[in-house]
């Protein structure tokens, strides 16, 4: 495959550090083909995340049939979870599904400290969004990683009790 050839041409790239995202809606067309392709990539050491989870029509089918290790909760649910009980229920349900299927879960669209706090209380430890960092050039990432500090309220959450 093309990916195998690229990895072979660049042995300095460890495929275990590569994660490809599959948009839930893009897998609708041919789940068998998508699954076969994902399995071929897994054989190379590449991992997968299901992106925008909850926005498609067959989310549970994807959890069962696609070999992903991570679910990314769509930002539309995360952003509204503090004001909308339905969005909160969806986020809570997706976190529960991830745990049931022994998958990692990451919340997209974490805009505020309160979003992060709520997610931690639900047992979701991974997040991305402007509340953590704005997009930045790759060259700025090392300095950001050295200087970033989680909010004290986030650090105060006992993750064993929250899960």
What are the residue ranges of the model-derived segments?
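Short glycine/threonine-rich loop-to-helix capping motif typified by GTGT followed
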Residues: 1, 33-34
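Catalytic core of soluble alpha/beta enzymes
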Residues: 35-38, 42
């Amino acid at each position: 495959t093309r990916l195998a050839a690229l990895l072979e041409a660049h042995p300095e790239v460890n495929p275990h550090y590569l994660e490809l995202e599959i948009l839930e809606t893009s897998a609708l067309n041919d789940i068998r083909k998508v699954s076969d392709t994902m399995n071929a990539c897994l054989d190379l050491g590449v991992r997968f995340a299901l992106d925008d989870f909850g926005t498609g029509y067959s989310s549970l089918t994807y959890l069962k049939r696609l070999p992903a290790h991570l679910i990314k909760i769509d930002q539309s649910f995360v952003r509204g979870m503090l004001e909308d009980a339905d969005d909160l229920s969806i986020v809570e349900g997706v976190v529960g599904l991830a745990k049931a299927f022994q998958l990692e879960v990451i919340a997209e669209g974490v805009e505020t400290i309160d979003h992060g706090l709520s997610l931690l209380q639900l047992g979701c430890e991974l997040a991305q969004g402007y509340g953590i960092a704005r997009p930045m050039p790759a060259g700025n990432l090392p300095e950001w990683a050295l200087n970033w500090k989680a909010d004290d309220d986030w650090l105060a959450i006992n993750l064993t009790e929250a899960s």
